[in-house]
């Protein structure tokens, strides 16, 4: 991939499309990178109404944007508008990164990369692990794909609506036939049998206690068992706080956000950026927003 700084002197336009997008940390993260690498560019947020997504993408292409990130609720719809998909986007059925190149709209899924590498950074190995995925949406599908790809020993999807979870199971097993995937209801979780527990829902953003929703809480980890509670939400949710208090390893979604963003940046600009700078930037942005919120109370 060519480093675009050597390819053109034109200003680079990037962005993120979703609804809502006001909470997104991606503009702060990517604009910091553009400044760091002395790239004349800007990363902008675009809140798009449902039904207007295809027009928004075509409009950004007409405006000569280099690429955009796609967030909720448009990741699945983005698959349909792309002329080309990478293997992960095609398999998962979800696009979070678009590149406008050679009159084509190219779709990528870097969320899978972000989750996989963040687990590795934490010192855990998905291979042969027993993994619980809480949720049945697009994020759960991505997590399940990564676990199956890495030969997890057992994957159990826990969701209120079993039909959605069964669909994920069926789709992923069609790609990885030997994967061991089960579907259960929330109340049947036995934390003692699990190595990695992933919250793939948005519960926790507003302070909801996911353990209350699923009807069970992990016991104190007196044996110091190696077990990871992982939240795809990038703030300290009750899920993370309670698991940590009980003595377990925890990881929120900050590194997943950073790593998927780093991969997107590389796709657009041919340059893999400095991960630590990205992590520092989003931590500072979260702290700044928290301070601003507290000052208005």
Show which residues each predicted segment covers.
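Rossmann-fold NAD(P)-binding glycine/threonine-rich loop
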Residues: 225-275
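Phosphate/diphosphate ligand-binding glycine-rich loop within oxidoreductases
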Residues: 2, 7-122, 236, 242
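Short glycine-/small-residue-rich Rossmann-like dinucleotide-binding loops
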Residues: 73, 199-203, 233-234
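Rossmann-fold NAD(P) dinucleotide-binding segment
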Residues: 205-229, 237, 241
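Rossmann-like NAD(P)-binding element
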Residues: 161, 189-212
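Short acidic low-complexity segments
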Residues: 176-194
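Glycine-rich adenosine-cofactor-binding loop
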Residues: 18, 107-109, 119, 123-124, ...
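Short, conserved loop/helix-junction motifs that constitute active-site signature segments
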Residues: 5-8, 126-127, 149-151, 213-226
């Amino acid at each position: 991939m060519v480093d675009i700084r050597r390819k053109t002197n034109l200003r680079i336009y990037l962005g993120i499309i979703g609804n809502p997008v006001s909470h997104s940390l991606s503009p702060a993260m990517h604009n910091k990178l553009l400044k760091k690498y002395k790239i004349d560019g800007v990363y902008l947020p675009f809140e798009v109404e449902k039904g207007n997504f295809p027009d928004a993408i075509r409009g950004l292409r007409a405006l000569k944007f280099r690429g955009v990130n796609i967030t909720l609720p448009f990741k699945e719809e983005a698959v349909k508008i792309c002329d080309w998909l990478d293997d992960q986007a095609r398999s998962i059925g979800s696009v979070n990164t678009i590149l406008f190149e050679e009159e084509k709209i190219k779709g990528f899924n870097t969320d899978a990369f972000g989750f996989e590498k963040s687990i590795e950074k934490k010192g855990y190995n998905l291979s042969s692990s027993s993994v619980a995925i809480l949720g049945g949406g697009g994020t759960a599908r991505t997590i399940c794909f990564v676990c199956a790809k890495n030969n997890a020993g057992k994957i159990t999807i826990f969701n209120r609506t079993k039909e959605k979870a069964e669909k994920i199971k069926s789709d992923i097993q069609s790609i990885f036939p030997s994967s061991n995937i089960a579907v259960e209801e929330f109340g049947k979780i036995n934390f003692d049998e699990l190595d990695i527990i992933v919250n793939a829902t948005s519960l926790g953003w507003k302070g909801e206690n996911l353990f209350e929703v699923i009807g069970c809480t992990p016991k104190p980890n007196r044996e110091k068992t190696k077990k990871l509670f992982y939240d795809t939400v990038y703030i300290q949710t009750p899920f993370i706080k309670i698991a940590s208090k009980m003595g377990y390893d925890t990881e929120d979604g900050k590194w997943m956000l950073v790593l998927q963003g780093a991969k997107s940046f590389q796709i657009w600009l041919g340059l893999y950026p400095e991960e630590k700078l990205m992590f520092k930037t989003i931590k500072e942005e979260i702290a700044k927003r928290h301070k601003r919120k507290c000052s208005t109370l």
